[in-house]
């Protein structure tokens, strides 16, 4: 599979656009996994952390949102949800082919979900960023998101949806859970590198359950 695809924005069918961005930095950590997925509910800080992690490792950075837009891997724009309708078969074909053809590259991939688009491969791990649901609600409100969409994402965070999806695809040994609440991207990257080097994976003791802290009904009344 080619490293680049025609850029749907250019209008020139012969033009090319790299699907990823090489981030120059220091020497890669040879002991770390080759595919590091940074995932979590929209609004937890995946993009900032993923870019900084890629820079720290001298790795390539890929973002599902960017790929969908720049490569035209969507079926249109959902105005109510304010997001593109992902063409999952197209994304799955392009992304898995790219990863297969570039096994020698370390790649940091940022996405809110990957259970329906990525095949489990050797050297793949997921880092699930978590965020206090009330902090998440305030952050999304600051982005002028509709109340209903804010609640949908807060609810997903409350019930550990991103964590569940990651564990379902990769299993406990390849999933790491990090609480991003009150932490800068730099601090989160340092924490991620520590847990990846330890290589112990996920456990029930990783983080507190948000449902132990918040009553969903009371929280929804504060948001809606």
Predicted regions and their residues:
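Hydrophobic positions on the alpha1 helix immediately C-terminal to the Walker A/P-loop
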Residues: 49
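Conserved lysine of the Walker
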Residues: 46
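Hydrophobic anchor at the beta1->P-loop junction of P-loop NTPases
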Residues: 38
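Conserved phosphate-donor/acceptor-positioning beta-strand/loop module used by diverse small-molecule
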Residues: 122-143, 153
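ATP-dependent small-molecule kinase phosphotransfer cores
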Residues: 60-118, 214-218
